[in-house]
Design a protein with these regions (language model features):
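A basic, amphipathic helix-loop patch mediating RNA/tRNA/ribosome contacts
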Residues: 1-48, 82-83
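Conserved class I S-adenosyl-L-methionine
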Residues: 79-89
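Glycine-rich SAM-binding Motif I of class I
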Residues: 91-92, 113
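Conserved S-adenosyl-L-methionine
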Residues: 96-104
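S-adenosyl-L-methionine
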Residues: 106-159
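A short glycine-rich, Lys/Arg-flanked "PGG" loop and its adjoining helix->strand segment in the class I
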Residues: 158-175
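Short, glycine-/aromatic-enriched active-site segment of Class I SAM-dependent methyltransferases
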Residues: 180-197
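Flexible, glycine-/basic-rich loop-and-beta segments that form/coincide
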Residues: 234-267
Length: 267
């Protein structure tokens, strides 16, 4: 079975809209089976290898698309706020924050030399590379964080929320990427590190909401990331806000989001 290339890009979460997909295809950054394709209506096989190369997605990395979707789905904005990008890597979230009005972004990552040059040289960015978020203190920052994002690997959100609680303002908002492959027991992680079972995804979201609430954050929204993880894992966006009376969403909401993610991203 074949599908239009622009449709494929949207259905598989590589690009947010058909309009943007068409523009990017025409700009020559979309490759199918290692061959550049510049016609949006090109019919391709469902199992084709499709890549978007370069930075024409509008951000230095695909992380920007994740935060972009969160801002479309949830009532949140980094505009006018002091922000933190936890697990910054290349800086997709940082880039998106700046493009949406952030006054300052602390870009935190344990790695070194990954942050895009345009962000390293931006005076609004505080590059905190070689930094484990678990060691960051309020005194080290000197000011509270008003908006934060979390996109970390090989560590559970269970370890992130206590720090987020300590360094943020009383009404801080955040977007956390929930990754089943790093929140599940080893016995539930399948071949190539991929967690496919929807029931496990529901369990992971239930636990993640619990971690948030236990550290003073209400869970105000859930949706799925428009971009799969590197190995093909479906990941989720969790919108949290600090609260004196933390509350979580009903598990039925998580189940609906999981079902929607699989029907949209798994073909």
């Amino acid at each position: 079975m074949k599908i239009r290339l622009d449709q494929y890009l949207v259905q598989h979460g590589l690009i947010q809209s058909r309009e943007r997909a068409k523009a990017m295809i025409m700009s020559g950054v979309v490759f199918v089976n290692e061959q550049k394709v510049d016609k949006a209506g090109e019919m391709i096989k469902e199992d084709a290898k499709v890549e978007v190369r370069g930075h024409d997605i509008g951000y230095v990395s695909r992380g920007g698309l994740k935060l972009e979707k969160a801002m479309q789905c949830f009532p949140l904005t980094p505009n006018g706020k002091v922000c933190m990008d936890i697990g910054a890597s290349t800086g997709g979230f940082t880039d998106c924050m700046l493009q949406n009005g952030a006054v300052k972004v602390y870009a935190v990552d344990v790695g070194y030399g990954q942050l895009a040059w345009k962000l390293r040289t931006d005076e609004r960015v505080v590059n905190m590379e070689r930094t484990n978020i678990r060691s960051v203190t309020p005194d080290q920052l000197g000011e509270p964080i008003e908006f934060f994002s979390v996109d970390v690997s090989f560590i559970s959100l269970h370890h992130i929320f206590p720090v987020a609680q300590a360094i943020t303002t009383p009404d801080a908002m955040g977007v956390c990427l929930v990754k089943p492959q790093f929140e599940s027991g080893r016995e539930k992680v399948g071949k190539n590190g991929v967690v496919r079972d929807p029931a496990t995804h529901c369990e992971v979201l239930h636990n993640a909401m619990g971690y948030a609430a236990a550290n003073g954050f209400s869970v105000r929204g859930l949706d799925f990331s428009p971009v799969k993880g590197p190995e093909g894992n479906i990941e989720y966006l969790m919108f949290v806000q600090k609260s004196a009376e933390p509350a979580v969403l009903d598990d039925s909401v998580a189940k609906q989001v999981v079902e929607a993610s699989h029907s949209t991203l798994d073909h």
